[in-house]
Amino acid sequence: DCCHNTQLPFIYKTCPEGCNL
């Protein structure tokens, strides 16, 4: 998922609006 940080799954990366998993 583009919103999940691969190192810390509970932390969200910056990604385009609409990707808010």
From Swiss-Prot:
Q: What is any one of the record's Gene Ontology cellular component terms?
A: membrane
Instruction: List UniProt keywords, sorted A-Z.
Output: Disulfide bond, Membrane, Secreted, Target cell membrane, Target membrane, Toxin
Q: Record keywords: Disulfide bond included?
A: yes
After translation, how is this protein modified?
Answer: Contains 4 disulfide bonds.
The tissues where this chain's protein is expressed are given as: Expressed by the venom gland.
Q: List the molecular function annotations (GO) for this entry.
A: toxin activity
Q: Is this entry keyworded Disulfide bond?
A: yes
User: In which broad location class does this protein mainly occur, judging by the first location in its UniProt entry?
Assistant: secreted
Subcellular localization is given as:
Secreted; Target cell membrane
By sequence similarity, the record places it as follows: Belongs to the three-finger toxin family. Short-chain subfamily. Orphan group XV sub-subfamily.
Role description: Has hemolytic activity under low-lecithin conditions. Has low cytotoxic activity. Inhibits the expression of VEGF and bFGF in human non-small-cell lung cancer cell line NCI-H1299 in a dose-dependent manner.
In its miscellaneous comment, the UniProt entry states: Is classified as a P-type cytotoxin, since homologs have a proline residue at position 31.
What is the name of the protein in this document? Cardiotoxin-like basic polypeptide ah
| Lineage of source species | Eukaryota, Metazoa, Chordata, Craniata, Vertebrata
